[in-house]
Amino acid sequence: MPRMQTPRITIWNEYIHERESAAVAAIYPRGLHRTLADALGRQPGLTVRTATLDEPDQGLPPAVLDATDVLVWWGHAAHEAVKDELAARVQERVIAGMGLVVLHSGHESKIFKRLMGTSCHLCWREAGERERVWVINPGHPIAAGLGDCIELEHSEMYGEPFGIPTPDELIFISWFEGGEVFRGGCTWTRGSGRIFYFSPGHETYPIYHHPDIQRVITNGVLWARPQGRPAQVPRHVPVEQARQPIVARGASVHDQAGKLASRHA
């Protein structure tokens, strides 16, 4: 995955609710992926494209993934419709250095669960209650430009316990009007790839139109972009290429090229 001076962002959205629910379509008439693309497009130095589940190869053929430095993922109604092969390809790209920003209900996506290795389950309630997203790591780049918290008048409650591995960094904790709290902004590294999960974003509320939410996602994309050189694939180093002269000793089940010798030889 080549590194570019201009980060290439792909926003993937299953794009189902906007076409099946009048309430969601009224908020995101062109799809929430277009709202996010418009917001990211205002950030100088980003190249932004969108992809949806109904496109060929579910929107992410190998050529698109190869041309993506950070993938933004939103899914809810069609987690199981995402092909296992696609989830595996995304996982491979992340481990090789592609950044991943997972939003809201994407915590149940195949790709997020693969990378976390845990259930990723949580508690939830859809009641349009107030959410206060507290910035608990104000010095982190993802929190740049924010105040003490983000106030959302209407939101879906996500609550603990949240079945994720301990985050490398915890940036936001949400409080909800009903009393619950939630680790709503977390980061991890998998291989050479950076991952940011951000919980606000229920589809029936205009959360992705909120300037501070857009700022967090933009900051998250900038933070998650590839760092340095990509991870190298495993490779065999022949004896004659050792940095210091050595002599091979003992038996081996590999041939001189490093491949397993035939079991039937």
Segments and roles (model prediction):
Residues 2-6, 126, 190-265:
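Extracellular ligand-binding/catalytic regions of CAZymes and related secreted enzymes
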Residues 5-27:
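Short glycine-rich His-centered loop
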Residues 12-14, 103, 198:
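Short hydrophobic segments within beta-strands
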Residues 14-15, 74-76, 201, 225:
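Cell-envelope and extracellular/periplasmic
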Residues 17-21, 180, 206-207:
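Short, solvent-exposed loop/turn elements at domain surfaces
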Residues 25-109:
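Helical hinge/lid and interdomain linker segments adjacent to catalytic or ligand-binding clefts
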Residues 46-49, 122-199, 234, 248-253, ...:
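Catalytic beta-strand/loop cores that center a nucleophilic Ser/Cys/Thr
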Residues 78-146:
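A glycine-rich, often tryptophan-bearing local segment used as a flexible ligand/cofactor-contacting loop or short
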